[in-house]
Amino acid sequence: MQGRSFKTICETGREPADWKKAAYYRYWMHLAHHDNPGHLGLRTKDYKLIFYYGLGRDDKTPRTPPGWELYDLKKDPQELVNVYDAPTYASVVTDLKKQLTARRHAIGDDGSDYPEIEAVVQEFWNYDAAARAKAEQISHDFRATMEAPAAAAPKAKKPN
């Protein structure tokens, strides 16, 4: 884990002037244990930007649709309303994506270790109409994959 101790902040309630303004994180455990898709994100005091790339580090889990979420933590601290597509947040999205790219590169997460995942990040980075349509198709495919075992399962007999 990169960073430095925040013990003094906990003790004093004050941040040093040179304290980082954003934290980058990555959730690698695609659909493991509690079914969260693989994603990466950036959190500031005011916002949380998340990109779900929907791939595991192996072929054992099905692909989920790539997509973006943005939460205004001042107005929505419980992260209930995704404002990524709200026009009033367009400049926030642009700024946070720049910060996300900078943080990734600063810690050496350039995507070269998992090129399949990085290809998805790059393909869906701008999330235009074509990317959204492809994500929707991936969503339909994921649903079909998840429903197939249930449809093939033997039906329970009705009691007499």
Show where each model-derived region lies.
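Polar, surface-exposed loop/tail segments
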Residues: 1-42, 82, 89-98, 112-115
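Residue-level detector of intrinsically disordered/flexible regions characterized by low predicted structural confidence
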Residues: 23, 50, 157-160
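A contiguous binding-surface segment within folded domains or other stable secondary-structure elements
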Residues: 29, 50, 72
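Low-complexity, glycine/alanine/valine/leucine- and proline-rich hydrophobic stretches
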Residues: 39-69
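Long, internal low-complexity/basic segments
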Residues: 83-160
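Intrinsically disordered, low-complexity polar regions and short flexible loop motifs
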Residues: 76
